[in-house]
Amino acid sequence: MAGRGRRRFRLVALDMDGTLYSSRGYVEELERAIVVLVAEMLGLSMEDAARRLMEAKTRALTTSASLGLLGIRRSEFYERLSQMVNPASHIKPRPGLEDRLRRIKACGVKIALHTNAGRPLARKVLSALDIKPSLFDFIVTSDDAEPKPSPQGYELLLLSAGCRAEQCIYVGDRALAELRTAKMMGMFTVKVGGRESIWADLHAGDIVEALELIEKLIKD
């Protein structure tokens, strides 16, 4: 851990879905709504929409990146999707999460949110978690940059924070869809949940544990 102290790290960037919370119920609701919406926007049957989406995700890795391959405007898609789902039915505030985020900010480190969701849906998820968007120094969504795994959003994070890649800690739950890009750019990566990965420098069971490890890392 030597040399990774306070003067090195200036930014902690956090993925949202699957990282700040874990909810199978919400994931299932979201996946159903996504297929319904793809079917509506492309004029397809549900079966064909699910097949087309699966084929696109095989190439693009994430739903957001797949939308471009399907010829769907992301901004319209996520605006409509945000009206179809209710995150608060499944996601509840996580005790200790906001406190841990504030402790990291108190170390003089910026906190950012990086999500492939559009801004309206991100606001609903944060509301379900009882976290105000203003807690983050800045938020990058698929409305602001090309979605993960494209490096564009990561570059915007660094530009907004005024720091280099090696001064950023990136936290996410998906190795190939998000941590790989961060790691290849030179960021320090933390994986939340699931199996350990070659693309993660640290692994944590959940977000609170991850933030505890990060605080120690920053103060080391």
Regions found by a protein language model. Name each.
Residues 1-12, 98, 102-105, 109-220:
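Asp-based, Mg2+/Mn2+-dependent phosphohydrolase catalytic module
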